[in-house]
Amino acid sequence: MVKFYDKEFGSRLLIGSALYPSASIMQDSIRDSGAEIVTVSLRRETAGGKVGDVFWSLIQKLGVTVLPNTAGCRSVREAVTTAKMARELFATSWIKLEVIADNDTLQPDVVGLVEAATILIKDGFEVFPYCTEDLSVAQRLVDAGCQVIMPWAAPIGSARGIVNRDALKLLRDRLPDITLVVDAGLGAPSHAAEAMELGFDAVLLNTAIAKAEHPAVMAAAFKLAIEGGRLGYEAGLMGPRDFASPSTPVIGTPFWHAVS
């Protein structure tokens, strides 16, 4: 089980609802992923009438927990306003907080992120902040009251996998009581397994699934990879070594194999 604030879930895969070729493929992908939490964009919901209504109806039929986000927001004021609108629309205090600094890299504005998180937490929100892998930023978010931290593995949609493994491992080591979710930059099931092997609590995926040739199949693949990676972490992974170590004991080796 993984805990997000006061709620527990069986699946460690969170999934986004954007970029799918069709609504039916989105539904199939969410189902096959086993995800219990789906992120949705307020901008999509308010963009226009019937399209938004149909989309929301499809999400509701899946019986999942909705995590609205502030995707596309580029200022503290915009992010806070969007979060408040999302709380009214979706009737939840959860918000995936994004404050973007650069249009090309979609890198988080970490200064604005901490400021927005502080404002929202004081207003009763339970914040899921999308941030870089910088420990000092993560610590400031924790100090502000965030119980969940969502660092990127690489830039959004890049499919590069974990770029700074050491920094992510440091986050896990230094924030043992915080729920850590790798968010953005993963492209293959093996990337997700690696994140879980580092001890992260969950993974959020969207582009890697939605843009796959067969999204629903890819969703199932990520599900299995995340389960395998977590199980490996819980089993206690053997650390790397600089030299070979025989798996067969040398005791009892025949004399003719002995080194003179």
Swiss-Prot record:
Q: Which HAMAP family match?
A: ThiG (MF_00443)
* Binding partners and assembly: Homotetramer. Forms heterodimers with either ThiH or ThiS.
Say what the protein does.
Answer: Catalyzes the rearrangement of 1-deoxy-D-xylulose 5-phosphate (DXP) to produce the thiazole phosphate moiety of thiamine. Sulfur is provided by the thiocarboxylate moiety of the carrier protein ThiS. In vitro, sulfur can be provided by H(2)S.
An example molecular function term from Gene Ontology annotations: thiazole synthase activity
Q: What EC number is given for this enzyme? A: 2.8.1.10
Q: Where in the cell is it found?
A: Cytoplasm
Catalytic reaction annotation = [ThiS sulfur-carrier protein]-C-terminal-Gly-aminoethanethioate + 2-iminoacetate + 1-deoxy-D-xylulose 5-phosphate = [ThiS sulfur-carrier protein]-C-terminal Gly-Gly + 2-[(2R,5Z)-2-carboxy-4-methylthiazol-5(2H)-ylidene]ethyl phosphate + 2 H2O + H(+)
> Which Gene Ontology terms describe the biological processes this protein takes part in?
thiamine diphosphate biosynthetic process
Question: What positions does UniProt annotate as the active site of this protein?
Answer: K96
For this protein, the record's PANTHER family field holds: THIAZOLE SYNTHASE
Q: What is its main location?
A: cytoplasm
Q: Output the superkingdom of the source species.
A: Bacteria
Q: Give UniProt keywords alphabetically.
A: Cytoplasm, Schiff base, Thiamine biosynthesis, Transferase
Where is it found, in Gene Ontology cellular component terms?
Answer: cytoplasm
The species this protein was found in: Rhodopseudomonas palustris (strain BisA53)
- Associated pathway: Cofactor biosynthesis; thiamine diphosphate biosynthesis
- Please give the Gene3D superfamilies that the UniProt record associates with this protein: Aldolase class I
Q: Which SUPFAM superfamilies match?
A: ThiG-like
The name under which this protein is listed is: Thiazole synthase
Family affiliation: Belongs to the ThiG family.
| InterPro entries for the chain | Aldolase_TIM, Thiazole_synthase_ThiG, ThiG
Q: Where does 1-deoxy-D-xylulose 5-phosphate bind?
A: G157, A184, G185, N206, T207
